[in-house]
Amino acid sequence: MTSKLDQLKKFTTVVADTGDFGAIKSLEPEDATTNPSLLLKAASDANNAKMLGEAFDGSKGDIGLACDRFAVAIGQEILKVVPGRVSTEVDARLSFDTNALIERSERLIGLYDAAGIKRDRVLIKLAATWEGIRAAEKLEKDGIQTNLTLLFSFAQAVACAEAGVFLISPFVGRIYDWYKKSTGTDYTGAEDPGVQSVTRIYNYYKANDFKTVVMGASFRNLNQIEQLAGCDRLTISTDLLKKLAEDTGTLERKLTPDKAGEKRSDTVKNLTESQFRWASNEDAMATEKLAEGIRQFARDQEKLEALLSAKKA
């Protein structure tokens, strides 16, 4: 019998959301994504101690550079076991500084360049703030492709598409978490607010012929993944990938480009900064989850820096 994972791979590019090389190798995804939380987990793994030490040794005491060197080293190892791309994230504390985001992105891609990794195998991850989207717009024009993450609202998705970013990562599970806590309802199937958000974005992009790739992220259960089967890409934790690999039930495709036009309901165009900020202000869930996500990644970045700083002693 064919597993649901193999069925999913027929119409969706499957991406592993992990820095675990062994798990990636066994599950055979096309791409992989990392973030500060996953890098912190990798840095705490004794198997990566040598890599962590080398990142510090080559940084001349610059802890921020050491973190970037470690992120790129993890990315290099991942690229040995995936045929596609790896996403490497910029320090979340820079999320509201366009110029700083551009500079840090250029440093990351420069480290990949120095390691002999072609740019078409790397996506630079930025939080989908207004400043992050503007940075991505500039980077894309300069040949550096981006992945806009921590995306919780339709306004973020529209702004990203209009900026010509390569890929967005709209979150499913964190949206579900917020609504479940807010309403007390345990949403399932197509009623899941996270599923509805990604479906709306996917349909809008296809109906308007936007080329930006939609990669659903942050899943809490298999049903959320199944409801988005057919999305351009889905980045999935190793635990859920393993469950998909073990399930031999039938998987039905839910999202298709040819049906998207029938469900088009929004025609927002040329979103201005004031419109973007107002839409964000009016969406309590998106405002709270974006801020929370940036804070969480910033704290994990600080913990990673502390690990590297300890090597100075």
UniProtKB/Swiss-Prot annotation:
Gene Ontology MF: a single term: transaldolase activity
Record Gene3D superfamilies: Aldolase class I (3.20.20.70)
Cross-referenced SUPFAM superfamilies: Aldolase
Pathways per UniProt: Carbohydrate degradation; pentose phosphate pathway; D-glyceraldehyde 3-phosphate and beta-D-fructose 6-phosphate from D-ribose 5-phosphate and D-xylulose 5-phosphate (non-oxidative stage): step 2/3
Source organism, top-level taxon: Bacteria
Catalytic activity: D-sedoheptulose 7-phosphate + D-glyceraldehyde 3-phosphate = D-erythrose 4-phosphate + beta-D-fructose 6-phosphate
Record keywords, A-Z: Cytoplasm, Pentose shunt, Schiff base, Transferase
Leading EC class: transferase
GO CC annotation terms, alphabetical: cytosol
Compartment(s): Cytoplasm
Family classification: Belongs to the transaldolase family. Type 1 subfamily.
Role, per record: Transaldolase is important for the balance of metabolites in the pentose-phosphate pathway.
Full protein name: Transaldolase
Organism of this sequence: Pseudomonas syringae pv. syringae (strain B728a)
Gene behind the chain: tal
